[in-house]
Amino acid sequence: MSFETLNKSFINGKWTGGESGRTEDILNPYDQSVITTASLATGKQLEDAFDIAQKAQKEWAKSTTEDRKAVLQKARGYLHENRDDIIMMIARETGGTIIKSTIELEQTIAILDEAMTYTGELGGVKEVPSDIEGKTNKIYRLPLGVISSISPFNFPMNLSMRSIAPAIALGNSVVHKPDIQTAISGGTIIAKAFEHAGLPAGVLNVMLTDVKEIGDGMLTNPIPRLISFTGSTAVGRHIGEIAGRAFKRMALELGGNNPFAVLSDADVDRAVDAAIFGKFIHQGQICMIINRIIVHQDVYDEFVEKFTARVKQLPYGDQTDPKTVVGPLINERQIEKALEIIEQAKTDGIELAVEGKRVGNVLTPYVFVGADNNSKIAQTELFAPIATIIKAGSDQEAIDMANDTEYGLSSAVFTSDLEKGEKFALQIDSGMTHVNDQSVNDSPNIAFGGNKASGVGRFGNPWVVEEFTVTKWISIQKQYRKYPF
């Protein structure tokens, strides 16, 4: 199926052209070819979408568990039936390899599968004992209302569905704005899937627009009860300021400076395998990506030798070639930012073990070794195929280095002693730590989220149910109650 025609906003069940008079070309990052051209929606259209979503939500909240499950099942079916075409569109739009794009679609479908398991949580009633004679206490779980959802360019379909599916499963409505660079895989394919599934008009509205048109409209509109955002910590702080003033809930997955620690008793070959994947999947453009490789001095030389040898063999180029491992960065701005980081590291005197190069819009891998944990490169979220290896004198120093960052999203540790690995993991101040694995892990039934400057809230069942619903206490006095006056 061709998805290039899905270049309009989806508002109130209709494909609606933007009224701004402005358009945005959606480009293939590898060759800059135009995939399609989107017309951008206005701030007024966004306001209308929130009004529509609010009205639609009141009816959707009355839907049955079976109704919601059926919609999710049909949306899943649409994605599965169009699997190959969707994978190719994700690759073309994001610059992600076929490997990455396949993983992304599989994760998206898994989110829908999991969402079907908790549609019955809505409307659940729990009776709680009362110390007042004749009183019955009931706690109801109700939809939260309208959700404002904003997703990034890197894993657009997965990170969009992570908010949209639970919202719909739990009786909410959604106004969703994908990054315009990945508007199709991050927005309109999802809208098409739910249109196919028979979701009532207005429950999901997908806005193709940009900040120039809508400003902070996704944040300041009084209708949404929760802002779900995945992106930079800087933007997350801005959202926090606005949401805090309005007492809105937030679900924020933000930046990361994720450590990958290799202890003295680690299987170095296994650690290298994990580090190669966890550093270079999607060219390093993932919030959970390995940002610092911290290696115990006893295995440091062996690790560096084996890691750099593997890096030099990674195939790069056109992301739609199934053999490619390292594809293009998303845009020129990201390339320039990466090159600036590289030049600064060179200026700082950090040893370059593998020197990559720019080939068109592809940046081949760079590996810096012997970096200080306080260096600029070690304290910067790289979002590029740049590896930084740091030597640790002891396990405790590795822990201290791992925690020496404002971020706390994901982390990993390699050791042959699993008990020691688990104890190490508990000392890392991050939302997620993986023993004998790399840092890029996700599943729809775990508590996904970060600590410190890496976010607020948790995705994954059952934690997401708490995020996207509200509880209400209703007490029923069944017999006359005596009052003190």
UniProtKB/Swiss-Prot annotation:
- Keyword annotations of the record: NAD, Oxidoreductase, Stress response
Recall the GO molecular function terms of this protein's record.
Answer: aldehyde dehydrogenase (NAD+) activity
**Null-mutant phenotype, please?**
No effect on vanillin degradation.
Reactions catalysed according to its record:
an aldehyde + NAD(+) + H2O = a carboxylate + NADH + 2 H(+)
Catalytic residue list: 253, 287
Q: Where does NAD(+) bind?
A: 231-236
Name the InterPro entries on file: Ald_DH/histidinol_DH, Ald_DH_C, Ald_DH_CS_GLU, Ald_DH_N, Aldehyde_DH_dom
Concerning PROSITE patterns, the annotation shows:
ALDEHYDE_DEHYDR_GLU
E.C. designation(s): 1.2.1.3
Q: What induces it?
A: Activated by SigB in response to stress due to ethanol.
Q: What does this protein do?
A: May contribute to protect cells against stress due to ethanol and related compounds.
Entry similarity comment: Belongs to the aldehyde dehydrogenase family.
| Name of this protein | Putative aldehyde dehydrogenase AldY
What is the protein's species of origin? Bacillus subtilis (strain 168)
